[in-house]
Amino acid sequence: MSKKFWSNIFLALGVFLAFAGVATISVSADSSATIESNTSSKIIDGATYEENIRGVIPITLTQYLHKAQTGEKFIVFVGFKECVHCRKFSPVMKQYLQQSQHPIYYLDYGNNGSFSMASQKQITDFYSTFATPMSFMGTPTVALLDNGKVVSMTAGDDTTLSDLQQITADYNNQ
């Protein structure tokens, strides 16, 4: 056998062993790590969420739509207890409720909330109140409605007290 044949065999074997060694390297991450955020890394349970939002006025989807259709000006918090983002946001809502000059209505978006028994038309009508330029972006959402449309809104668990105070300012200036 030729020298070239053996050098090709050794080269192929070397490449194979190099890649085989790379393939057996495993990487793992600590699945219990907590990711810090700009609000809080504390996990908030459902009972604490309910305590944090004490002071909101629960309304049904029918009541919400009636307020919107009659042109009433109001602030609504759309959320639900099982929503991780809503629970994370709830301490900010608690602060806001302590200083709010206006009633804050609460529309339960969860599986057992107002939407669970709503007709398709009611659900469509709800989403139409968030028409251009603002669309419903999920929960938690705090919105100011006037004349049947959202005129000011904030959404997400990174909503700050300042964001909510801006909604109050918009309410006062409408």
Curated annotation (Swiss-Prot):
CDD domains: TRX_family. Coiled coil: none annotated. The keyword Transcription does not apply. GO terms for biological process: bacteriocin biosynthetic process. It comes from Pediococcus acidilactici. Keywords: Antibiotic biosynthesis, Bacteriocin biosynthesis, Plasmid. The keyword Cell wall biogenesis/degradation does not apply. Probably involved in pediocin PA-1 biosynthesis. The gene is pedC. This is Pediocin PA-1 biosynthesis protein PedC.
